């Protein structure tokens, strides 16, 4: 019996929606990465983008476990001498509340061309409003 690999043109994509309100960032990101990658499907192939679109709402209300809210640091480097900056989650939430979820998910998907393509199917919104109601997203609960 031969192993079946799904072809890119055969993939049927669905839309899922996850509410991140009062949910732990890592657990939300893990579920989102699984859905984006397509690992929940029986036809998963590691070299084919078999994943679905994922909408994350209330991203600004996601929480960290433990003391990460005060101790975790995000860093950015401009490329110049002395150009490294560090930001706490509190500072990030004020400027870009979606970044925390996006950064966590980006770290959980492959770091190659396929991963960049997978990442385009992630839609993160600060509040509960989103423009994807026409796609009839399926609500996902975190277990």
Curated annotation (Swiss-Prot):
CDD domains to which the protein is assigned, alphabetical: Ribosomal_L13
Transport: present as a keyword of the record?
A: no
So which domain of life are we looking at? Bacteria
| GO terms under biological process | negative regulation of translation; translation
* Record's keyword terms, sorted: Ribonucleoprotein, Ribosomal protein
Signal peptide (residue range): none
Q: Does the keyword Ribonucleoprotein apply?
A: yes
Mind telling me which Gene3D superfamilies this protein's record contains?
A: Ribosomal protein L13
Q: Which GO terms describe its cellular component?
A: cytosolic large ribosomal subunit
| Self-association state and partner proteins as the record states | Part of the 50S ribosomal subunit.
Q: NCBIfam families in the record, alphabetically?
A: rplM_bact
Q: Which HAMAP family match?
A: Ribosomal_uL13
State the name under which the record lists this protein: Large ribosomal subunit protein uL13
Q: Which organism is it from?
A: Methylacidiphilum infernorum (isolate V4) (Methylokorus infernorum (strain V4))
Q: What is the lineage of its organism?
A: Bacteria, Pseudomonadati, Verrucomicrobiota, Methylacidiphilae, Methylacidiphilales
């Amino acid at each position: 019996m031969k192993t079946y690999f799904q072809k890119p043109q055969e993939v049927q994509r669905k839309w899922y929606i996850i509410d991140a309100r009062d949910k732990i960032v890592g657990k939300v990101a893990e579920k989102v990465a699984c859905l984006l990658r397509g690992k929940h499907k029986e036809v998963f192939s590691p070299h084919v983008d078999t994943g679905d679109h994922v909408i994350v709402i209330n991203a600004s209300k996601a929480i960290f476990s433990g003391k990460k809210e005060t101790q975790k640091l995000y860093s950015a480097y401009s490329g110049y001498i002395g150009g490294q900056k560090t930001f706490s989650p509190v500072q990030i939430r004020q400027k870009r509340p979606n970044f925390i979820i996006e950064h966590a998910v980006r770290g959980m998907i492959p770091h190659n061309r396929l991963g960049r393509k997978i990442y385009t199917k992630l839609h993160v919104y600060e509040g509960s409003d989103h423009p994807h109601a026409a796609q009839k997203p399926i609500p996902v609960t975190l277990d």
